[in-house]
Design a protein with these regions (language model features):
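Second-shell residues forming the walls of enzyme active-site clefts
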Residues: 79-94, 104-108, 171-348
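A substrate-binding/cap region within the structured catalytic cores of diverse enzymes
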Residues: 123-145, 152-173, 180, 184, ...
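Active-site-adjacent structural elements in enzyme catalytic domains
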Residues: 76-93, 126-142, 354
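Short acidic, glycine-rich surface-loop motifs adjacent to enzyme active sites
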Residues: 36, 57-76, 236-268, 473-490
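Short glycine-enriched loops at secondary-structure junctions
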Residues: 44-47, 96-106, 146-156, 198-204, ...
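Hydrophobic faces of well-ordered beta-strands that scaffold small-molecule active sites
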Residues: 35-43, 67-71, 94-102, 147-151, ...
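Short, acidic/polar
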Residues: 47-63, 128-139, 224-235, 305-311
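Preference for extracellular/luminal or secreted protein segments
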Residues: 1-60, 273-274, 283, 304-575
Length: 575
């Protein structure tokens, strides 16, 4: 018998009034309204480039009765205006989610980045992830968000994986628990009624592929999973996490243990696997909260079966909310047909909607709607990008920037001894969902010049090196800055030189002192094993760049700690 929700228990612990609101609201819903509560819609500023609808936001709410909202982009004022309007137009208050994985920058364009998961791990202190969670909740609440799709509780076990390379909080269960527990506590400490959603069950980071592009597979056996990802999920469930995002990631060995009839051909991502969501997560681990699918346009889901089938199957399998429409009318019809045909039973539908309404009641959204405090005011935005948060960003960078190696003692670099710097800058194509800062190269150059260095930026579009003696006569040191950023256009991201055997390639490591600095991914030594000094800095914001230069010049100590994945299983990387 599938587990059904207990609204008196963790994570809801509803009082009599809250419980009554849930039951009365549920009893008053028509079938179409119940189905609508299952959906998160992705809203846009301007034309909808995702589902292609021509409906106004108010028309979407009136026609499809959605339970949750996400949005893409926008300044804090734009986001606040959007979310206020959505809440004003919705009869039942909305769950409004943001991806604040690293701070308030996940809820609005002018929000404050604090620290990525990798950065939190490198800092080896609970203060950095706690502050990251605190800022995430403060700034997201100010714009009207009440649910954070974070922290990420994946474990980075495979160094080739780049989709969670910087987002995961470590390479062991203990490290992930330490950092993500602090981040969740920081979110709750804000006192802003922002719910926590951990992701991506049953766990990313074991393989190199990206579930955005292909079915993800976690190949761990049941005992291994229980002692790693299982411990992480059990910890957060015990701590009262309200929501868990199921990934489009299969866990085949555990699926076959729970349902011995399954063959390889039957293995599904967790989002479509009742033995994982109902059996492992809700029954064995005792999760009583809301399960939401990861985004339904991802290939890990779309490659499983027809959309007509997987839309209702996700809910039938134990997920309670479905993330994003493709075509609104079609998807809504698919879900409604799934209920009418019995794919989704009446009991499963009511249980899912009861969980959704229960979370809304826990967040007091109905009370705020009744007393007129659900919409946020302009003065609330004063916290976004405030001086305290910017100071915390700088302190997080200082605590985490990591000297991975300096085997020839080439650091520090000082203008008195290494005045003429050849600067090599490596980035990725622009135009993606995530991309490198357009200011990063200028920021690095200006910081170096401010300290008295003479900086020449290399033109890496050529493969002509020129005379090596002339190079040594003109250059005192080389700094290679890798700002490789990417998301869901490739299964993994590595350094891509500007041209075959570009002059950016570190051919010069034995000619002049050479240091490589990564502003994002932590494993570039795989493609640059020859460099003798290597630094992981984790981000390209101005504070981080300033502090990196402080540390390269010996004005500040390196304080971050690396994990052994930085060596990418290459013995020569340590030389």
């Amino acid at each position: 018998m599938p587990e059904t929700v207990d609204l008196r228990a963790v994570p809801y612990e509803l009082d009599d009034e809250q419980h009554a609101w849930v039951e009365e609201t549920l009893a008053g819903l028509e079938l179409e309204e119940k189905v609508g509560q299952l959906f998160f819609n992705l809203f846009h500023f301007g034309a909808d480039s995702f589902s292609g609808t021509n409906l106004s936001n108010a028309e979407i709410l009136a026609k499809y009765h959605i339970g949750g909202a996400r949005y893409h982009g926008g300044t804090s004022e734009q986001v606040q205006d959007l979310l206020n309007a959505l809440q004003a137009s919705s009869r039942i208050p909305l769950l409004v989610a943001a991806n604040c994985e690293s701070g308030g920058n996940g809820c609005c364009n002018d929000g404050t980045y604090i620290a990525s998961g990798a950065q939190c791990d490198a800092a080896r202190t609970e203060e950095v992830p706690f502050r990251t969670g605190l800022v995430s909740a403060r700034e997201s609440a100010a714009v009207g968000v009440n649910l954070n799709f974070a922290p990420i509780v994946d474990i980075l076990l495979n160094w080739r994986n780049t989709i969670v390379n910087t987002r995961a909080h470590g390479s062991t269960a203990d490290d992930v628990i330490r950092s993500t527990d602090a981040k969740a506590r920081g979110m709750r400490a804000a006192g802003e009624d922002v719910a926590v959603c951990i992701k991506h069950f049953p766990g990313d980071g074991t393989e190199e592929r990206d579930q955005h592009l292909v079915l993800g597979v976690n190949e761990l056996g049941p005992a291994e999973w229980d002692d790693s990802f299982g411990r992480v999920y059990a910890h957060h469930i015990g701590a009262g996490v309200e929501m868990i995002m199921a990934g489009h990631i299969a866990l085949p060995e555990y699926s076959k243990l729970l349902d011995p009839s399954l063959t390889d051909a039957d293995i599904m991502p967790a989002t479509l696997a009742p033995e994982l969501v109902q059996g492992l997560l809700k029954t064995r681990l005792g999760f009583n909260g809301v399960v939401v699918t990861d985004a339904s346009h991802m290939l890990g889901m779309t490659s499983a079966m027809r959309r007509q089938d997987y839309v209702p199957r996700a809910i039938a399998s134990g997920c309670d909310m479905f993330l994003f429409f493709n075509d609104m009318a079609e998807d809504f019809g698919f879900m409604l047909d799934g209920v009418r045909s019995g794919v989704i039973t009446a009991e499963r539908l009511d249980d899912a909607v009861r969980r959704i309404l229960g979370l809304k009641a826990k967040l007091n959204l109905h009370r705020k709607q009744a007393d007129g405090t659900l919409q946020r005011a302009r003065e609330d935005l004063a916290v976004v990008g405030c001086a305290e948060h910017l100071q915390w960003r700088a302190e997080a960078a200082d605590a985490s920037i990591t000297l991975v190696k300096n085997t020839l003692d080439q650091l520090p670099l000082r203008p008195e001894t290494h005045r003429r710097i050849r600067l090599y800058y490596l980035d990725t194509d622009s135009g993606g969902i995530f991309e490198a800062s357009q200011r990063a190269l200028d920021d690095v150059r200006e910081e170096l010049e401010r300290r008295g260095f003479e900086v020449t930026v290399n033109d890496g579009t050529s493969r002509v090196k020129g005379a090596t003696l002339k190079y040594r006569d003109e250059v005192d040191a080389a700094i290679v800055v890798a700002n490789v950023v990417g998301y869901a256009a490739e299964n993994n991201y590595r350094i891509r030189w500007k041209t075959p055997m570009s002059t950016d390639c570190p051919w010069y490591v034995h000619e002049v002192p050479t240091v490589m600095v990564s502003l994002n991914y932590t494993t570039h030594l795989h493609d640059a094993t020859m460099v003798k000094a290597y630094v992981n800095a984790y981000h390209d914001n101005p504070d981080t760049i300033r502090l990196v230069v402080d540390k390269l010049t010996g004005e500040s100590e390196f304080r971050g700690t690396y994990n052994d994945l930085v060596w990418t299983e290459k013995w020569q990387a340590k030389l």
